[in-house]
Amino acid sequence: MNHEELINSLTKKMNGALQVLDADLKGLRVGQASAYFLDPVQVEAYNSRVPILQVATISVSDTKTILVQVWDKSLVKAVKKAIMEANLGVSIISDDNQIIRLQLPIPSEERRKELVKIAHKYQEKSKIIVRNIRRDGIELIKQMEQNTECSKDEAHIYSKEIQELTDKYCDKIDKIIKLKEQDIINL
């Protein structure tokens, strides 16, 4: 693997860390209803636990209401139970046949602070992923140096580039979290 391939590979992996962060943050409800809000819900169906998206269609009717249309009428109770057990702080306001309406309350100040803490945990998790990618990249540079694929000076330059890439992605993570924090606080 040459220097350019290594940097491209590390960049791709670090972009993956940003995608994981984005997916994590979509699960944090801040002000508006989102179809992603129910992603963590697992339903007991057909003798196993499955994601809610495998048994229902989720849509948003307005900023505070999520509609869950269960495909199989026999699973409506299981879906309602799974939503309640997920402890997402939603109220089931009606269930017309196979459609369950969920009302999202405006988060209290305490809940917003809790959401900010959760966002910061996601931030740290993402930074750890990026730093582990950096560590792996630097290990590869050291191996290249030992195998005389690059000189000591080149290895130093490559390591510095990897560190700059790491700093760039850590800054991106910080900016994403700062924006999310502002969204949460300014509800």
UniProtKB/Swiss-Prot annotation:
Question: Mind listing the GO biological process terms from this record?
Answer: cytoplasmic translational termination
Q: Where in the cell is it found?
A: Cytoplasm
Q: Which GO terms describe its cellular component?
A: cytosol
Which GO-annotated molecular functions does the record name? ribosomal large subunit binding
Q: Where the protein is mainly located, per its record? A: cytoplasm
Q: What UniProt keywords are attached to this protein's entry? A: Cytoplasm, Protein biosynthesis
Under NCBIfam families, the record lists: frr
Q: What does this protein do?
A: Responsible for the release of ribosomes from messenger RNA at the termination of protein biosynthesis. May increase the efficiency of translation by recycling ribosomes from one round of translation to another.
* Family statement: Belongs to the RRF family.
Q: What's this protein's name?
A: Ribosome-recycling factor
Q: Give the source species.
A: Orientia tsutsugamushi (strain Boryong)
